[in-house]
Amino acid sequence: MEGVSALLARCPTAGLAGGLGVTACAAAGVLLYRIARRMKPTHTVVNCWFCNQDTVVPYGNRNCWDCPHCEQYNGFQENGDYNKPIPAQYLEHLNHVVSGSPGPRAPAQPLQWVSSQVLLCRRCSHHQTAKVKQLAAFSPRDEGRYDEEIEVYRHHLEQMYKLCRPCQAAVEHYIKHQNRQLRALLLSHQFKRREADQTHTQSFCASAVKAPAQVIVLRALAFLACAFLLTTALYGTSNPFAPGAPLPPTLPTGSNGSAPPDNGTATGAEGWRQLLGLLPEHAAEKLREAWAFGQSHQMGVVALGLLTCLLAMLLAGRIRLRRIDAFSTGLWALLLGLHLAEQYLQAASPSWLDTLKFSTTSLCCLVGFTAAVATRKATGPRRFRPRRSEKQQ
């Protein structure tokens, strides 16, 4: 340790460059670690194009899977066609009727779809069949105006094969009945989706508030580094772990610069000496060496504090980013700049630089303590806002 201290004392610029290099390498290593952890998921959630139901499938089958709800194949090309041949499209014996049992929350009366033969009379049903056949056999005079010609032809068939009054009334009543049932299903679907969004938002907020353990440890380490700098500024060149070490000097109150004896100060000094006497000799020696090393390399301690703040912000992520973390990092950067200016000026440094450095260290210590203690409040996502329907928009 003494050899490293002597080397850094001879080459302060090299020591600073080495500290900055270690900081950059550590930050790059953490960034590469986070990028490497972003692996593709094994499963993903897909939505059926036919029944609009969500299903969890393997990640490799996200564009080729069968829906377990409606048993339809979901796999499409860029032009909208299927990405594989479907024999059931042209072989009738491969198709079967799909039926499902209603869920516990399903309405007591499910949707009932009736055919035109049940809803219409024999004459109107025959007319509708003839109209469909004639529309299927329609051939336009000009292929470029196919849409216009078939619309005119459809209107002509509607006028020719009008429904009788009883059938027209039955059709209108049936349409109103289906509209009511579909509206109830739509409202129920929107309500369930809103409940799912609220549950997801609440769980996401709960996970966003809790900071990881490594982030809390890094914030505490930054506070301890700043507390060490503040303590060294208060003690000056003295070592508090040395035998017979005094307490931090107090401001003089007399006109001649000498402070009157204080019983509280004397009692505190005696208690500190007794506490040091309880420590083993080798432990006290290690503490003295660590104090001397940190006191002679305060710029390295400042670089360590700045590195811990940056790593804490990087590991916390954008969701848990707080203003106090950014403010603490700015104070650490300012403190590093003041130490660099003091080392550059050396003997010609002005007196106000020490005052500014002590004030910045005190403020950084206070902000670091607040950032280390207040670990439950995060910016997180905003308050949940329910989606508006198309009519409200």
Swiss-Prot record:
Cellular component per GO, a single term:
nuclear membrane
**Principal location listed in the UniProt entry:** nucleus
Positions in the Perinuclear space compartment: 236-298, 345-357
Give the positions annotated as glycosylation sites: 256, 263
Keyword Transport included in the entry's annotation: no
Q: Where in or outside the cell is it found?
A: Nucleus inner membrane; Cytoplasm, Cytoskeleton, Spindle pole
Q: Which loops or segments lie on the Nuclear side of the membrane, by the record?
A: 1-214, 320-323, 376-393
**Keyword annotations:** Acetylation, Angiogenesis, Cytoplasm, Cytoskeleton, Glycoprotein, Membrane, Nucleus, Transmembrane, Transmembrane helix
Q: What GO MF annotations does this protein's record show?
A: actin filament binding; lamin binding
Query: Mind telling me which residue stretches traverse the membrane in this protein?
Result: 215-235, 299-319, 324-344, 358-375
> Origin, by domain of life?
Eukaryota
**List-wise, which residues carry N-acetylmethionine?**
1
- Output the GO biological process annotations, alphabetical, semicolon-separated: angiogenesis; nuclear migration along microtubule; positive regulation of endothelial cell migration
Which Pfam family, an example, fits this chain?
A: Ima1_N
Task: Identify its membrane topology class.
Answer: Multi-pass membrane protein
Q: Name the segments for region: Disordered.
A: 246-266
Keyword Transcription found: no
Sum up the protein's function in the record's words. Answer: Critical regulator of angiogenesis and endothelial cell (EC) migration. Promotes the migration of endothelial cells, which is essential for angiogenesis. Interacts with the linker of nucleoskeleton and cytoskeleton (LINC) complex, which plays a vital role in connecting the cell's cytoskeleton to the nuclear envelope. This interaction is essential for maintaining cellular structure and facilitating the movement of endothelial cells, which is critical for proper vascular development. Involved in nuclear movement during fibroblast polarization and migration.
Share what the entry says about its subunit structure, partners included. Interacts with SUN2 and LMNA. May bind to Ran GTPase; has a greater affinity for Ran-GTP over Ran-GDP.
Give the record's family classification: Belongs to the TMEM201 family.
What protein name does the entry list?
Transmembrane protein 201
**Gene name, please?**
TMEM201
